[in-house]
Amino acid sequence: MSAFKPTIKRRESTKIYVGNVPVGGDAPIAVQSMTNTRTTDVEATVAQIKALERVGADIIRVSVPTMEAAEAFKLIKRQSSVPLVADIHFDYRIALKVAEYGVDCLRINPGNIGREDRIRAVVDCAKDKNIPIRIGINAGSLEKDIQEKYGEPTPEALLESALRHVEILDRLNFDQFKVSVKASDVFLAVEAYRLLAKAIKQPLHLGITEAGGARAGAVKSAVGLGMLLAEGIGDTLRVSLAADPVEEIKVGFDILKSLRIRSRGINFIACPTCSRQEFDVIGTVNALEQRLEDIITPMDVSIIGCVVNGPGEALVSDLGVTGGNKKSGFYLNGERQKERFDNEYIVDQLEAKIRAKIAAQDPKNRIL
């Protein structure tokens, strides 16, 4: 890793807890996703939650649209070790039911669950059971009067909607909440979050909503979330993709890793390849990414196909390989080793070295 250290001054915010996961304050930025199974299919939903846990999800959101889904949530919660957020709209009784079943956070907008007495019932329940709330504002579902006032979604419209819901919780003396102001347009979302960051002290959940498929959505999220994170804004994040939710977690950690905010697993530094490559760099990287998905200890590994940039990258990596004729140079902790790798077996050899180094320095294979 380069000795250059970026300076990111984190926005000050209050700290809340989603289950056992701290959010805001000086807590690590949490990465979360959302199940896309039918919640009433308990087996499928639990299986997806387990898959998300394996790739490092800190928090997982589950849609609970009906009382039938609430009953399924009870069974799902029993089989989950990661904190679960129940996504609820309109029916306050569902919020009360999942609270009874041990939900770790409620994703509701207080203003859309009806009369003041219903809002108070949910908030009082959240107070009694120490359950935080996430206010989730979306550019596609702003209140009618705000739509009419602004004509179209604007940063100011998203802010006004958010503050309207915040005011309800303030009036009920409830401060254990976080807020999101999502939009599918990067600049709209970024500016809305900037305004919100100045207006309240609560933690902010970041997201570019409906970002798109795996490739386009990852790029859009990286740009938008990266802008905010580099400014110190954000306490949790979700990369919203029309893809397997597991990919959301992987991309989320990749974004944090690229900004050196939080690292998980191997950071591969690999060249795009050209005719100088002495071994199959692309195939090597792809194979190692799959083989080493179980690794959560942060580590920089450079895989460069020739001697032009290879030695320089290897000097600032934990492990490095520099392409050579039939055999490639191997670097450990920035120092060239006498040992060389046979290019034909470079994947097996490099995997063994990575696992040996991790076993020596971090037997518990931990996440930062």
UniProtKB/Swiss-Prot annotation:
This is 4-hydroxy-3-methylbut-2-en-1-yl diphosphate synthase (flavodoxin). Gene3D superfamilies: Dihydropteroate synthase-like, Sulfite Reductase Hemoprotein, domain 1. It catalyses: (2E)-4-hydroxy-3-methylbut-2-enyl diphosphate + oxidized [flavodoxin] + H2O + 2 H(+) = 2-C-methyl-D-erythritol 2,4-cyclic diphosphate + reduced [flavodoxin]. Keywords: 4Fe-4S, Iron, Iron-sulfur, Isoprene biosynthesis, Metal-binding, Oxidoreductase. It comes from the Bacteria. Pathway: Isoprenoid biosynthesis; isopentenyl diphosphate biosynthesis via DXP pathway; isopentenyl diphosphate from 1-deoxy-D-xylulose 5-phosphate: step 5/6. The lineage of its organism: Bacteria, Pseudomonadati, Pseudomonadota, Gammaproteobacteria, Pasteurellales. Its EC number is 1.17.7.3. Binds 1 [4Fe-4S] cluster. It comes from Mannheimia succiniciproducens (strain KCTC 0769BP / MBEL55E).
